[in-house]
Amino acid sequence: MQVHDVMSTSIVTARKTDSVRSIVIKMMNRNCGAIPVVDGDARLIGMVTLRDVLLPLYPNYGEYIHDNVHSRDFVEMEEGYPEALGRKVEEIMSQNPLTVAPNAPVLEAASYMGLKNFRRIPVIDKGMLVGMLSIGDINRGLFFEKGMRG
């Protein structure tokens, strides 16, 4: 079974100039935790996850080491969320994301995803975004291909 057999082709995308707020709305409406960022030619330039949205609110590693984290006012930190939503996607997106080709074996893609602890990855063909592959897609494909027989 190959990636193109199970990938999703109905893809919600973002542009690097989009607001983080608009991306979070897309994620909530589609019940997904990651959206690919594309340029004007539909070429993948990054990924944004819900975790990326929250990262600017967290204390950084140096603050954890040098400060007493328990003395932080996490309620006050939470007040920074609206400001984080006003940022541009390009400020928080991950560049050069892990990708997979449509003709790759499904379990090869699953192993890469497992190693990186990713729930979904973009599918790229000739530099163009053609789909997204999720753990759910893989499980559905394997179940209907192999599980229905047993």
Show where each model-derived region lies.
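A short, polar/charged loop-to-alpha-helix boundary motif
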Residues: L54-V69, N139-G150
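Short charge-dense sequence patches
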Residues: D5, G40-R43, L55-I65, I135
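Extended hydrophobic
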Residues: G114-L115, S134
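Short acidic/polar capping segments at secondary-structure boundaries
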Residues: P105, N117, M128, I138-N139
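Bateman/CBS regulatory modules and CBS-like beta-alpha motifs in cytosolic regions of diverse proteins
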Residues: M1-C32, V37-G40, L44-I45, N68-Y112, ...
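Histidine- and aromatic-rich ligand-binding microenvironments
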Residues: D5-V6, S19, D52-V53, P105, ...
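Short hydrophobic beta-strand motif reused across regulatory alpha/beta modules
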Residues: G46-T49, G131-N139
